[in-house]
Amino acid sequence: MPQSADPVHVVGGGLAGSEAAWQIATRGVPVVLHEMRPQRTTDAHLTDGLAELVCSNSFRSDDPEGNAVGVLHAEMRQAGSLILTAADQNQVPAGGALAVDRDGFSRAVTKALEDHPLIEIRREELTTLPPAEWDKVILATGPLTSPALAEAVLSLTGETALAFFDAIAPIVHFDSIDMGKAWFQSRYDKPGPGGTGADYINCPLDEAQYHAFVDALIAGEKAPMRDFEAKTPYFDGCLPIEVMAERGRETLRFGPMKPVGLTNPHNPTVKAYAIVQLRQDNKLGTLYNMVGFQTKLRHGEQARVFRTIPGLENAEFARLGGLHRNTYLNSPRLLDGTLRLKADPRLRFAGQITGCEGYVESAAVGLMAGRFAAAERRGEALVPPPLTTAHGALLAHITGGHVEAEEAGAPRSFQPMNINFGLFPPLEEAPRGEPGKRLRGAEKTLAKKKAMAARALAHMAAWLDTPARAA
């Protein structure tokens, strides 16, 4: 593949920026990757590594047939994703999910980018709009975009940014968990990548313990919000556990503490009223994170409240939970169909700042932005992935998913979105069962998902194989 002399500048070394830089460089186009850490850090980052995971260590389901994020995984592998390659190399057992050793994952991404001959990494903060001589730029500054740069971008658009909160779950040392009360089991004994079907630690609560826990959560002292945070809405996919508890006493046991698909081997005849799950957080198996337990409780309150959970009475925390404010653009109004800023098309955006939600989605948007930028630099036509693919469905949501609804007289605010089958266009033909058998209920739903997944992977492969043509 012939090389292009002029670089594309990628600002931000998170999941999206790292993936974008990789996709550009592998297409023979030089890249300058700008990362402000360690010169300037954030409240959520702990290292200066590229693609650091600041929240969960899970990339969610790896099922390429029945789960939309699993389809996105598969498409990214088809496209030579650096993020998925590093995740596969650093996976830890997690039932049906793809979870990673966060430090090993970040090191693998950092090394791959440092070793690529067409990638230059500059450790510096960008506080203003990129200089005019940077004619191709991807801004992948993420949910923790520095205030100065956010203001500079907003001054160009005339719009205000939307913001939401992401909360961070606590991490517990394995050897402090009482396995005489807790046990290993995946829900419904389902194995996943590198897993055994017994990949989660489960802590059971009876009805009285559950209600006492809910009371303690609600009464627990929360960290105060700064003035600018008070009006910021939470994203439903990452609600603090105490906010869920405040929404209803039974909310948690139908959410992250649901007891279904699990049997306590210490007391197999008694069904738990609720169950707390912990997922392996590092390859050594020495750390486990509390699934769905992101929180804004003060640190002292967290230790006190979470130690009321059976099995965690003597828990030692490697990290306590926290909360950080995320910022994202009103992308349907501000970005075109290839993620360029309408007000200044030399600027392209990628990752969570575009309004996608989740590690995998952020990296996928980075993958598309990188391919678009490389094609543009090489004078090739910009062809978005088909709407029938997970990438195409995600892109359509970000760049146009809400504008049509508003124009039709049904306004609603643009919100962060995980990939899901609801973003895919309907099947041209409904799946059929065996001759003489009509699909119904769950069987019909699963057949539709499998058909959508098969269509997505076939169409993604065809898109990737399409020869480039001149713009």
UniProtKB/Swiss-Prot annotation:
Subcellular location: Cytoplasm
Cofactor(s) the protein needs: FAD
EC number assigned by the record: 2.1.1.74
BP terms from Gene Ontology: tRNA methylation; tRNA wobble uridine modification
Reaction equations catalysed: uridine(54) in tRNA + (6R)-5,10-methylene-5,6,7,8-tetrahydrofolate + NADH + H(+) = 5-methyluridine(54) in tRNA + (6S)-5,6,7,8-tetrahydrofolate + NAD(+); uridine(54) in tRNA + (6R)-5,10-methylene-5,6,7,8-tetrahydrofolate + NADPH + H(+) = 5-methyluridine(54) in tRNA + (6S)-5,6,7,8-tetrahydrofolate + NADP(+)
Cited InterPro entries: FAD/NAD-bd_sf, MnmG-rel, MnmG-rel_CS, MnmG_N, TrmFO
Residues annotated as binding FAD: 12-17
Keyword tRNA-binding: no
Cellular-component GO terms for this entry: cytosol
Cytoplasm is among the record's keywords: yes
Keywords carried by this UniProt record: Cytoplasm, FAD, Flavoprotein, Methyltransferase, NAD, NADP, Transferase, tRNA processing
Domain of life: Bacteria
UniProt GO MF annotations: flavin adenine dinucleotide binding; tRNA (uracil(54)-C5)-methyltransferase activity, 5,10-methylenetetrahydrofolate-dependent
First-listed, main subcellular location of the protein, grouped into a coarse class: cytoplasm
Function: Catalyzes the folate-dependent formation of 5-methyl-uridine at position 54 (M-5-U54) in all tRNAs.
NCBIfam families listed in its UniProt record: gid_trmFO, PRK05335.1
Family: Belongs to the MnmG family. TrmFO subfamily.
Name by which UniProt lists this protein: Methylenetetrahydrofolate--tRNA-(uracil-5-)-methyltransferase TrmFO
